[in-house]
Each structure stands twice: as structure tokens, then as C-alpha cells.
């Protein structure tokens, strides 16, 4: 008699994805972030659902409904801060997951990589709309500034912005539609995750060496399930330390002031995980140029498979590329810092140099170094 998990139509899919899946024996902790992102998405959907039960998407009551959740709802404060800080954990895992893909050449799986970039964009859109919902000062002005960027699109820009706003400014209509989209997008993300996994399981996982590992595979369960459980426990530990000890560490104090269209905060800035893109946007004096740079800073990831000129897939045995990769990481940290600083000397010039370096490394330096390393292999 064959095992039910191998014959039952539903169990069979789960079995092939999580139990009997052949996985490379040498994948490191960097391969844990996929499961951690799945956990983050589950936490966000679960906490978000409970927040939506008490939230009202009306400009008059949105701010007070969030206050009501924190003060009057049983463990409402916990749910709210788990959701807010869960987003930060989500982005930390996302950046590490993408960085892993860049370092070990996982982008050579075109479909998996491109679906991943679409997922990144979808999560960024969801997080942006979620930040607007508490209707604090930074929510309102962040929504105004970012949606206003679309007015840089020639000819249709202004009409497009007013269409998104549902009026002539960010108001009730905007808040209501942002709530609707913020609610539905995570489920679209969950569907895209399934497609992401579908394409991944067509080829199998990459591994640190970048070599084909078909001759050395082990079952996912128990080896990698137990490894994932360790990662999950650490993620929950870090999240709960953040939530219970310093829940507002990554937030903005301005968001504890109700939205006021007549008073602009001194420094309008998004959440920390958008600061690198915000710094790139601000480093270009022209509005349309800034918007194009902002969009390019994410979409450039889709060019990685085309810019891969090395004869080796992974950076594991390519020290020059490794150095360049870590310079890119440092550059992104610098951009994140600059994005949170006021627009004044010397921050503006540092931001401009860091933005140029970001695009130069990806488009010119990494491909050039790959060609040099190819030459070195022949000597």
C-alpha cells in the first residue's frame, strides 16, 4: 500500500514541495530566507486581518480607530505593533533574500527571478499603502509626495494623479481605496509566491558553489525542515524583542500627530526600508529624472541575468566580484542613511555620488570585473 501523502491529490503537492523535495546537501543558512518570508507573509495577513476588524477607513475616524485598537481592544497594541514591525522584518528578509540571489547567481533562473522582482514591487506597494492607513502626519504627507511623483509623467501625469486620489487632493476617497488595495494585495502576493515556488521547483534550488548538484541531493524533511524551524524561532525572537521592548524604534514620531493638510512636517520621509530608493529619487534635481531613477533602482534587478558575463555562476570563487558586491551593499546602507537626512550639504552630494555608484556597479563595474576574472582563469 503506497503512503497516502504520495497518492492523495492535495497531499502529493505538499509532499513534493516540503517533504520529499530533493534539495542540495550544501545549501547554507542564506537559503533559509524563503521560508522566513513565507512566515512574515503569514504573520502580516493574520495580524492585518484582526486589525481590519477594528479599523475604519474614514479620514475623520482612521487615526482614532488605530488609537482605539491600541487602548481598548484585547492585545490590540500587540497585534498593531506586530504588524508594523513585521513589515520591517519582512523587508530585512527580502533584502537578504535578494542579496543572496545576487551573490550566488540565482538570477540565472529567469522566471523565478523575475517573479521575485514582481513580488518585491508588490510588497513595496502594499507597505506604502499600509503606511498611509493610520492617517498620521507622515501617512498623509508621504501619500501626497509619493503619489504626486506620477504627475511627472508627460501629458497624462496630472490626470493620473487626480484619478488615483479620487479628487484634487489626498482625502477620504484616497484612504478608502488604499485600504481596499492594502487588504487585497497580500492575497495576490500569496498567489505570486505559489508561482515563484512553481518555477523554482521546475529547476531545483541553486547552491553556494553554483554547480549542478543533481548527484548530491537530500530530502527536504527532516534536514531542512529542522533548519528552517531554527530560523523561524530566531525571527520570532527578534520580532518579539522589537515589539515588546521598543515598538516605535523604526517608526516616525510625526505619525503620532493626526494628519493635518495645513501643516507640513519639517522632514517628509518614508519608512526606513524605502529610504535607499528615496535617496536616489532626491539625488536628481529633475522631477521626471528622479522618478525614472526611482523606478530603475528596483527594475534594474531584472537586468541581472543579462549582465551576467562570468563563466562561473556563483561569486564563491570570484574574490574581485565579492569585493564589488560588498561595496554595493555598503553603498545601499549609505543611501538608506542619506534618505533619512535633510536636503542640505554635505548630504546631497553624498547621495548623488552613492546613486551614481549604485547604477555604475550594477551596469558597468560588475560585468567588467566578470570579464577580467574570465581572463584570469586562462592565465
UniProtKB/Swiss-Prot annotation:
The note on cofactor binding and number reads: Binds 2 heme b groups non-covalently.
The cofactor named in the record is: heme b
- The primary gene name is MT-CYB
Write the record's keywords in alphabetical order, separated by commas: Electron transport, Heme, Iron, Membrane, Metal-binding, Mitochondrion, Mitochondrion inner membrane, Respiratory chain, Transmembrane, Transmembrane helix, Transport, Ubiquinone
Q: Which PANTHER family match?
A: CYTOCHROME B (PTHR19271:SF16)
What role does it play? Component of the ubiquinol-cytochrome c reductase complex (complex III or cytochrome b-c1 complex) that is part of the mitochondrial respiratory chain. The b-c1 complex mediates electron transfer from ubiquinol to cytochrome c. Contributes to the generation of a proton gradient across the mitochondrial membrane that is then used for ATP synthesis.
Write out the residues that bind heme b b562.
83, 182
What is this protein identified as? Cytochrome b
Name the source organism: Marmota marmota (Alpine marmot)
Where is it localised? Mitochondrion inner membrane
Positions binding a ubiquinone in this chain are 201
- UniProt: heme b b566 binding residues: 97, 196
Q: What is the lineage of its organism?
A: Eukaryota, Metazoa, Chordata, Craniata, Vertebrata
User: What is one GO biological process annotated to this record?
Assistant: mitochondrial electron transport, ubiquinol to cytochrome c
- InterPro entries recorded: Cyt_b/b6_C, Cyt_b/b6_C_sf, Cyt_b/b6_N, Cytb/b6-like_sf, Cytochrome_b, Cytochrome_b_C_euk/bac, Cytochrome_b_N_euk/bac, Di-haem_cyt_TM
**Subunit comment:** The cytochrome bc1 complex contains 11 subunits: 3 respiratory subunits (MT-CYB, CYC1 and UQCRFS1), 2 core proteins (UQCRC1 and UQCRC2) and 6 low-molecular weight proteins (UQCRH/QCR6, UQCRB/QCR7, UQCRQ/QCR8, UQCR10/QCR9, UQCR11/QCR10 and a cleavage product of UQCRFS1). This cytochrome bc1 complex then forms a dimer.
Amino acid at each position: 500500500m503506497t503512503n497516502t501523502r504520495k497518492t492523495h491529490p492535495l497531499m502529493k503537492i505538499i509532499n513534493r514541495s516540503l517533504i520529499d523535495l530533493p534539495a542540495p546537501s550544501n545549501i547554507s543558512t542564506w537559503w533559509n530566507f524563503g521560508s522566513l518570508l513565507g512566515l512574515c507573509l503569514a504573520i502580516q495577513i493574520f495580524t492585518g486581518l484582526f486589525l481590519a476588524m477594528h479599523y475604519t477607513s474614514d479620514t475623520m475616524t482612521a487615526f482614532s480607530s488605530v488609537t482605539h485598537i491600541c487602548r481598548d481592544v484585547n492585545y490590540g497594541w500587540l497585534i498593531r505593533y506586530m504588524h508594523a514591525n513585521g513589515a520591517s522584518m519582512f523587508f530585512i528578509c527580502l533584502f537578504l533574500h535578494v542579496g543572496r540571489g545576487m551573490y550566488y547567481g540565482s538570477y540565472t533562473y529567469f522566471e523565478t527571478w523575475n517573479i521575485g522582482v514582481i513580488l518585491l514591487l508588490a510588497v513595496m506597494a502594499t507597505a506604502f499603502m499600509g503606511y498611509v492607513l493610520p492617517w498620521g502626519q507622515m501617512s498623509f504627507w508621504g501619500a501626497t509626495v509619493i503619489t504626486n511623483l506620477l504627475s511627472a509623467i508627460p501629458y497624462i501625469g496630472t490626470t493620473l494623479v487626480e484619478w488615483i486620489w479620487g479628487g484634487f487632493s489626498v482625502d477620504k476617497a484616497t484612504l478608502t481605496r488604499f485600504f481596499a488595495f492594502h487588504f487585497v494585495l497580500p492575497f495576490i502576493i500569496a498567489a505570486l509566491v505559489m508561482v515563484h515556488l512553481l518555477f523554482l521547483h521546475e529547476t531545483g534550488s541553486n547552491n553556494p558553489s553554483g554547480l549542478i548538484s543533481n548527484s548530491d541531493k537530500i530530502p527536504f524533511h527532516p534536514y531542512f525542515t529542522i533548519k528552517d524551524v531554527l530560523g523561524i524561532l530566531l525571527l520570532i525572537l527578534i520580532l518579539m524583542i522589537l515589539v515588546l521592548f521598543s515598538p516605535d524604534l523604526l517608526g516616525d514620531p510625526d505619525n503620532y500627530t493626526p494628519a493635518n493638510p495645513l501643516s507640513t512636517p519639517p522632514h517628509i520621509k518614508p519608512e526606513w526600508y524605502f529610504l535607499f530608493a528615496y535617496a536616489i529619487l532626491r539625488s536628481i534635481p529633475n522631477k521626471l529624472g528622479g522618478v525614472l531613477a526611482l523606478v530603475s533602482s528596483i527594475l534594474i534587478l531584472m537586468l541581472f541575468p543579462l549582465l551576467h558575463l562570468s563563466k562561473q555562476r556563483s561569486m564563491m570563487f570570484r574574490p574581485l566580484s565579492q569585493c564589488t558586491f560588498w561595496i554595493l551593499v555598503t553603498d545601499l546602507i549609505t543611501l538608506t542613511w542619506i534618505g533619512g537626512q535633510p536636503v542640505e550639504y554635505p548630504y546631497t552630494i553624498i547621495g548623488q555620488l552613492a546613486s551614481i555608484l549604485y547604477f555604475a556597479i550594477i551596469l558597468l563595474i560588475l560585468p567588467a570585473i566578470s570579464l577580467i576574472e574570465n581572463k584570469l582563469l586562462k592565465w
